[in-house]
């Protein structure tokens, strides 16, 4: 009865992944366009590109997850392990790329000198090998936990790639949210005397938003993974299980905000464009109504 109850909840989760895939694809393309279009040449654009690349891995894994959860595809355990490793690696890689990009932006605010480009290039050469190694090691630890759990399970399905234990989810919360944010906060505290008040509040706001959204994305799954309940609760638990996928949204949006010289410029331009579009649509509607009224008057005459 327990397996049947769980299987009833998988289509809802697959549909949720489908909507996330559609909107995240549009959002990633939009943010990449805005970053390329409005970003300055002296800012760490490569940091944003690497962050988008990591989140694109997670985004394009969603159709595979949809096929597995809906029962249309079946994969052996070895391929499930590869899928799980790539999924975790993309999340860790994006988080740590965002950390180094935040450090680069803090340096950009602190040191307005001609040596800025050299410092940024040196930081980029050092940080990206570190990001690859740290992300790979952290994802490998999750993979070992998955293999140990798979040996105790008799089914050949790939559901274990999604039914993570609470211990694994706590590790992901600590590795991808808590530790990166604490490192950036510590670096920000060491450089706070070199920052203006507006710059300090801006960076601190981004970090607090990232910490809040990251906790919201991981905490429900970590807290509810080991809880057993009835059929209705299984559906809610599986929706909570999909919340980490929403990192596609807020990591890329924060990467865009931190990589741009003035991130308010494209926001203002987009808002002006939307306002003008609404005005045009409203004016066209009024014209159509007016023309219909004129036609009716002519017909009466």
UniProtKB/Swiss-Prot annotation:
Q: Does the keyword Transmembrane helix apply?
A: yes
Residues carrying a glycan:
153
What is the membrane topology noted in the UniProt record heading this document?
Answer: Multi-pass membrane protein
Gene Ontology terms: cellular component: host cell plasma membrane; membrane
Q: Which residues cross the membrane?
A: 16-36, 49-69, 83-103, 123-143, 169-189, 200-220, 239-259
Q: What does the UniProt keyword field contain?
A: G-protein coupled receptor, Glycoprotein, Host cell membrane, Host membrane, Membrane, Receptor, Transducer, Transmembrane, Transmembrane helix
Extracellular side of membrane: 1-15, 70-82, 144-168, 221-238
Query: Which InterPro entries does the UniProt entry name for this protein?
Result: GPCR_Rhodpsn, GPCR_Rhodpsn_7TM
Q: Where in the cell is it found?
A: Host cell membrane
User: Which sequence ranges are listed under topological domain Cytoplasmic?
Assistant: 37-48, 104-122, 190-199, 260-301
Give the matching Pfam families.
7tm_1
Which domain of life, per UniProt?
Viruses
Question: What's one GO MF term for it?
Answer: G protein-coupled receptor activity
Q: Family, per the entry?
A: Belongs to the G-protein coupled receptor 1 family.
Name of the protein in question: G-protein coupled receptor homolog U51
Q: Name the encoding gene, please.
A: U51
